Design a protein with these regions (language model features):
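Extended carbohydrate-recognition surfaces in non-catalytic/accessory domains of CAZymes
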Residues: 52-104, 110, 114-121, 134-142, ...
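Asp-box/WD-like beta-propeller blade repeats and closely related beta-sheet repeat scaffolds
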Residues: 162-167, 174, 187-210
Length: 811
């Protein structure tokens, strides 16, 4: 019987339900949702998934001393002695700090602890699934120190490490503590320590917003043990007043930091799991669908060059998000076994994640992209830190160091959710496919299910039941939504008998995928890429963790698809399956397909940046056949190709402003802040001021136009004039604009973006709207919220428009 323990903080008492002898196998679960996590000990990866984790343990996960600051410190085992800034500034106030001892503690810096907590979580999770006692030992030492040094007055677990008011590092550290407890049964210490931490902050926790609000995850987990209903009440109150509750599910482009967004997307799912209120789950699902609608990339993740940035394949995504998004999607699986979310998890795990790191797991990218012929220092072609960072290079560590720590969580988080249990029956569920085994018990008899497969590199999974007793076990297995069978997208029942094997066919077709004016090849969960010839140079030969410089050969990747030819070729293609040792390193399958060489797209922009696929491609007449291999095996790659469809680019003749700045309140929706120019006809602008383009790609720089005036917290209007010599129903307006944006054609809103975007390097949104013969107009309302200065990011405020007519476009 559980005992009640009285805990006193500053004269105030609360009751903490003490949980006696919680073992590693004793899991509690959220009260709602159809499925629950299985005990860690029940799950074991095999084959190439086990090898991935072993390489992690031998790579950056197991060698933090190779990664520089802050990983070569004591991590959370005591306050850090010193902070170093070698490549930039990142401490919340943009003032460099190089301090030590008490001075460091007083500085209130939180970021070294975020990054080292990521590392500890990754270490704990890898050690869940492979034999890595050294990793377990590091995690235990850090937990011991933190639990022993909680503030005696209010239970604060972070106050001994930093004076920072940020609650975000504890979100990350909680997951490391939870991972360790899942394996070792260390729930007593976790629950007591974190319950005290949350109780000591009872008076302020409902006011937590942003990343502080992500403590909701730990609060609800602790509530499973303590039954403290105030934790749920405050979690609901926290979310109710949040920006996310007001924004998630809205059918508009939400521009948000990729890590913050992927972390926050789990909050309404968690609230559903603990309340059963369907509205939370519906909002969460709508929010995920909206993010993918606006920002999806061909490798299964969404763009986030720090901030979400549209769909085009020059955009990248922060490697942190491979971990954060899979962690979030896993909660959808617990809620209702959503097969579409599981499909997304597999596409991230089998494409985006391995495509962002070297195959020995000793180097990774900060920003990874589906099209990256060049991967070297200062080759960063996405809008954020354009040309000013090493983020596209494969390195052991980057600055800031968040991705270096966070990537360690990615694959073990995927493995953690491979097998679940159905709550109603206790039946095992193969939710994510791959070589693995599951151990369970039925009617007092122990059993083991072994999944033999090379999936996703083959089209079959074989399930064998092993038991010392005659036994029949009915399990559930997910059939992916892309699968060429009538029950695709469902969970199906498989009945296994001891000693017998049941095979599940997973037929996959080669498909041609299209989006706007670029196209790529896919097979089941795998995205396929072309690897252009390149020169790879080690910066420090002989160092197994040295950075790589990958430079393509000009003219060896400027291909496009003839769509009719490619459709026929894909339908008739024979995929070559190969026997390889490690399919994340050597291609286990390949296919050769026809392409057309084009005059455009054969050199890097400015000699070092990956250009966009051209809107209008001109074939040279040369036909070639190139090999496509799994994205996961590549470093440099071309995944998305332009086409040879005939399009006509229409001239954007000019852009006009009325020369006025209007007051803007960042706390209110942009659509609710309208001024007189919104009522004007386009010609009301043309007699006023013409805004000169400040970039060869016709970026109209509003910030430069208003130079010398106070622009923070203002908005203005910009009208584009476009000429067409004919009426054309099949026309596309490609708009890139920032900061906050609302666009109109013929007085009708055609696009809105909520959040910070960057006008020059934002991927264009594609707006289908006909053009008429003569002049055509688009008016764009542009708000400057004032959080970033024009001096710091001079290209943020403005817009770029490309309009073309004709051709066949994807969705």
């Amino acid at each position: 019987m559980a005992m009640k323990k009285i805990v006193v903080f500053a004269g105030r008492m609360f009751f903490l339900a003490a949980v006696s002898s919680i073992g590693a196998e004793a899991l509690l679960a959220a009260p709602f949702g159809a499925f629950e996590e299985a005990p860690v000990a029940a799950i074991r990866p095999r084959g190439h998934l086990e090898e991935f984790l072993k390489r992690q343990a031998d790579g950056i996960t197991g060698h933090p001393e190779k990664l520089g600051y802050p990983f070569n410190t004591k991590l959370w085992e005591g306050p850090l002695d010193r902070v170093f800034f070698t490549e930039g500034v990142y401490n919340g106030d943009d003032e460099p700090k190089d301090c030590e001892g008490e001075e460091f503690w007083k500085s209130g810096m939180w970021w070294p602890y975020e990054q080292t907590a990521y590392q500890l979580d990754g270490m704990a999770r890898v050690a869940q699934f492979v034999d890595a006692p050294a990793l377990d030992a590091v995690v235990k030492r850090n937990l011991d120190w933190v639990y022993a040094h909680a503030n005696p007055t209010n239970g604060d677990l972070f106050a001994s490490l930093s004076a920072s008011p940020s609650q975000w590092p504890l979100v990350v550290f909680f997951r490391a503590a939870m991972a360790y407890a899942e394996k070792h049964g260390d729930w007593d210490r976790l629950v007591k320590a974190f319950a005290a931490n949350y109780e000591g902050k009872r008076s302020v926790r409902t006011k937590w917003g942003g990343r502080d609000m992500l403590n909701l995850e730990g609060m609800l987990k602790v509530m499973e043990f303590t039954k403290d209903a105030s934790l749920l009440a405050d979690a609901k109150a926290m979310y109710a007043r949040s920006w996310e509750r007001k924004t998630f599910g809205a059918k508009k482009h939400v521009i948000q930091h990729g890590v913050s967004l992927s972390e926050a997307l789990k909050l309404p799912v968690l609230l559903y799991l603990y309340t059963g209120e369907r509205a939370y789950l519906d909002q969460a699902r709508a929010a995920v669908e909206n993010v993918y609608e606006m920002d999806e990339q061909a490798d299964g993740l969404f763009s986030c060059n720090e901030y979400t940035s549209g769909r085009d394949p020059r955009q990248g995504h922060e490697t942190c998000v491979t971990a954060d998004m899979m962690w979030t999607l896993g909660y959808f699986l617990q809620a209702d076994g959503d097969v579409a979310m599981a499909d997304r998890m597999e596409r991230i795990a089998y494409n985006a994640l391995p495509g962002s790191c070297t195959k020995d797991f000793r180097r990774h990218q900060y920003l990874s992209a589906v099209n990256q012929a060049v991967c070297g220092p200062f080759a960063q072609s996405a809008h954020f830190n354009y040309g000013e960072s090493t983020w596209r290079q494969y390195r052991a560590a980057h600055f800031p160091q968040c991705c270096t720590g966070n990537i360690n969580r990615s694959m073990p988080s995927f493995v953690r959710r491979m097998w679940m249990r159905e709550k109603a029956s206790g039946a095992p569920v193969a939710m994510l496919l791959g070589p693995s085994r599951f151990r369970g018990e039925q009617d007092g008899a122990a059993y083991e299910i072994v999944e033999e497969t090379r999936y996703p590199f083959e089209d079959e999974a074989r399930f064998t039941l092993k038991s010392d007793r005659p036994l029949a076990v009915t399990m559930k297995c997910r059939v992916p939504g892309w699968c060429d069978r009538p029950d695709a997208g469902k969970l199906v029942d498989l009945t296994l008998k001891a000693g017998e094997t049941v095979s599940l066919a997973l037929p996959a077709k080669l498909t041609l995928e299209s989006d706007r004016n670029w196209h790529w090849i896919r097979r089941g969960p795998l995205t396929l890429s072309f690897v252009p010839p390149a020169e790879t140079v080690e910066e420090n030969p002989g160092d197994p963790f040295t950075a790589l410089r990958i430079t393509p050969k000009d003219g060896e990747w400027n291909y496009a698809f003839d769509l009719d030819e490619m459709k026929a070729a894909v339908a008739a293609a024979k995929v070559e399956f190969r026997k390889v040792g490690y399919p994340f390193e050597e291609p286990a399958l390949a296919v050769r397909l026809p392409v057309r060489r084009i005059r455009e797209w054969q050199t890097l922009d400015e000699g070092r940046f990956m250009p966009d696929p051209p809107l209008v491609a001109h074939p040279t007449g040369e036909r070639a056949e190139i090999e496509f291999v799994p994205y996961a095996t590549t470093l440099q790659r071309i995944t998305c190709f332009a086409d040879t469809e005939g399009r006509e680019r229409l001239p954007v003749v000019a852009a006009y402003s009325n020369g006025e700045l209007f007051p803007y309140d960042p706390g209110k929706p942009l659509a609710d802040q309208s001024f007189e120019p919104e009522k004007w006809g386009p010609r009301d602008y043309t007699s006023r001021y013409q805004v000169p383009p400040r970039h060869p790609d016709l970026f109209f720089d509003v910030g430069a136009f208003f130079q010398g005036r106070k622009t923070e917290c203002t908005l203005t209007y910009l009208t584009f004039r476009v000429w067409s010599d004919r009426d054309e129903a099949n026309a596309t307006w490609c708009l890139s604009a920032g900061y906050r944006v609302q666009a109109f054609i013929d007085g009708r809103e055609v696009y809105a973006a909520d959040g910070i975007s960057e006008g020059l390097w934002m991927a264009p949104v594609w707006i289908r709207h006909p053009v008429k013969k003569g002049y055509n107009y688009m008016t764009v309302k542009l708000a400057h919220p004032g959080m970033w200065s024009m001096d710091q990011y001079p290209r943020l405020w403005g817009a770029r428009l490309v309009v073309f007519a004709g051709g066949k476009e994807g969705k």
